[in-house]
Design a protein with these regions (language model features):
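Pyridoxal 5′-phosphate
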Residues: 1-216
């Protein structure tokens, strides 16, 4: 989102960036303080992809709507879609973006949730596909692959517990093998674990992870 915000600034828009704390959290009070009479859009991640921080989207939406119901709220849910016990449409957001590649679906396909009553101007015009929002022939195979990935994940009712168990096991093993290991992830998300290895050169770690049994 940062690069998109920079593009908007080049077009003359003013963008306010909220500073997170050391765990990546954004305070709802900081969001309230940043709102202005001319604020048009608020955009926030659902899950930080580096630290696993889960943002209080529902509370943030409420704060924004209490200030001005006309401000649109967009949530980048790419890292949290179907990986949290969260119903995205229950967050109260106006717009939600998700991506297929995070779920094992084909690359290059995603989805945009648009709340009923919200009107958007298309960036691509032409044939009027996808309800006029994105003209051009649809990538049917990618869309079908995305839908099937969602169906399979939603049918696996133990997936969240399994992800958490795998993360807990990995952390326990890492701590036992590497006493100096430091955990920097927040623990909010069940599928993200971030650590640092003091005293180990990054290129050595990368080389080890590239060996059989490892992965990058």
């Amino acid at each position: 989102m940062l690069e998109t915000c920079k593009d908007l600034e080049q077009q003359g828009y003013e963008v306010t960036y909220l500073k997170p704390d050391k765990t990546g959290h954004i305070a709802v009070d900081d969001l309230r303080a940043a709102l202005r009479p001319d604020t048009a859009l608020v955009s926030m991640m659902l899950v930080n992809n580096e630290l696993g921080t889960v943002f209080p989207i529902a509370q943030c939406v409420q704060a924004v709507k209490d200030y001005d119901k006309g401000i649109l709220f967009h949530c980048d849910a790419v890292q949290g879609f179907l990986k949290l016990p969260t119903v995205l449409t229950g967050l109260g957001t106006d717009l939600v973006t998700v991506s297929g590649h995070k779920l094992g679906a084909p690359k290059g396909v995603g989805a945009l949730y648009v709340k009923k009553g919200v009107r958007l101007r298309p960036l691509l015009t032409g044939g009027g596909q996808e309800e006029g929002l994105r003209s051009g022939t649809e990538a049917t195979a990618q869309i079908a692959g995305f839908a099937e990935a969602c169906r399979q994940i939603m049918a696996d009712r133990t997936r969240l517990e399994r992800m958490q168990a795998i993360k807990d096991y990995a952390l326990d093993r890492l701590k036992a093998e590497i006493p100096k290991l430091e955990v920097i992830s927040t623990g909010d998300a069940p599928h993200i674990c971030a650590v640092t290895l003091p005293g180990y050169k990054s290129e050595v770690v990368v080389r080890v992870l590239g060996d059989p049994g490892g992965g990058i």
